[in-house]
Curated annotation (Swiss-Prot):
UniProt GO MF annotations: rRNA (cytosine-N4-)-methyltransferase activity
Catalytic reactions of this protein: cytidine(1402) in 16S rRNA + S-adenosyl-L-methionine = N(4)-methylcytidine(1402) in 16S rRNA + S-adenosyl-L-homocysteine + H(+)
Residue stretches in coiled coil: none
GO cellular component term, pick one: cytoplasm
Protein name: Ribosomal RNA small subunit methyltransferase H
Principal subcellular localisation of the protein: cytoplasm
Length: 307
């Protein structure tokens, strides 16, 4: 299955807010759908930088960089966005977008080891040039830690039973082996959902430190935004969306002064203004069922107080 960019027009339009020039970042290039649309809306003086750590995404991005001199790809995690931009002399930008979903090719190519639907080596690394593979990680992790990860990152109620079965199985080499163990250990299957869905999600998040990276990325993104610059982020499950929601809420709410024994006063430390929260339309969900769980949250950088 080829990759279909989710909330494509909504993301780019919310990012630009009617602008046609400036400096922008796609923090998760993927297969470049959002970046290409963004470039098509910008004038010849604009610049677009993109981040990715997936080797196949980097190949696609390198080809785009050859086609369009306004575009530059950076091989790095978006968790390093501020440092990497400063290294190339970019201190501030007009907009940053991120699509936190795993791309369809990653899910669908058996050799990448993400899929419980197709048998392949148990890998699950976004950047398969470094780090532990899923099979190596499962051998090293303690049963209690694994159960907690499956519960927290997969929101799986039978996490302890599943973790016990995985650890008792010993070395696993393929996604089919892991999926079968989870399937057998799972006492109650959800309608229209493979019983291994939540466990695979949890292991993938843990191996790639996905939630950690999001928590590091968001404040750096705001640091880089110019006043009126936009942050547009697409999430695909409640854990991601909760992080983004809480971050935007915190950055757009007046803080309480400690008061030091005096009556508390509100201190204006706000850096963001909420713009919108958007779901995929019925038409998009029909055309691309993977968009069903997607949420787009958009916020705008406020003017610096006292600047």
């Amino acid at each position: 299955m080829s990759h279909i960019s989710v909330l494509l027009f909504e993301t780019v339009e919310s990012l630009l807010a009617d602008r046609t020039t400036g400096v922008y970042i796609d923090a998760t290039f993927g297969r470049g759908g959002h970046t290409r649309l963004l470039l098509s809306k910008l004038d010849e003086n604009a610049r677009v930088y993109a981040f990715d750590k997936d080797p196949q995404a980097l190949e696609v991005a390198a080809a785009l960089a050859q086609e369009d001199p306004r575009f530059t790809i950076i091989h790095a995690s978006f968790a390093d966005i501020k440092e990497k931009m400063q290294e190339i002399g970019v201190q501030s930008v007009d907009g940053i977008m991120a699509d936190l979903g795993v791309s369809s090719p990653q899910l669908d190519q058996a050799e990448r080891g993400f899929s419980f639907m197709q048998d392949g080596p148990l890998d699950m690394r976004m950047d398969n040039s470094k780090g532990l593979t899923a099979d190596e990680w499962l051998l090293e992790v303690e049963e209690e830690d694994l159960a907690n990860i499956i519960y927290q990152y997969g929101e799986e109620r039978y996490s302890r039973r599943i973790a016990r079965a995985i650890k008792q199985a010993g070395k696993l080499d393929t996604t089919a082996q892991l999926a079968e163990i989870v399937k057998t250990a799972h006492p109650k299957w959800e309608k229209h959902k493979h019983p291994a869905t939540r466990t695979f999600q949890a292991i993938r998040i843990a191996i790639n430190k996905e939630l950690d990276d999001i928590e590091v990325f968001l404040p750096q993104a705001v640091d880089l935004l110019k006043p009126k610059g936009r942050l547009s982020v697409i999430s695909f499950h409640s854990l991601e969306d909760r992080l983004i929601k809480q971050f935007i809420q915190k950055e757009s709410t007046l803080a309480e002064d400690s008061g030091w024994g005096m009556p508390q006063q509100q201190v204006d430390t706000r850096r963001l203004k909420k713009i919108s929260r958007v779901r995929a339309s019925e038409e998009e969900v029909k055309a691309n069922p993977r968009s069903r769980s997607a949420w787009l949250r958009v916020a705008e950088r406020l003017e610096q107080k006292g600047a």
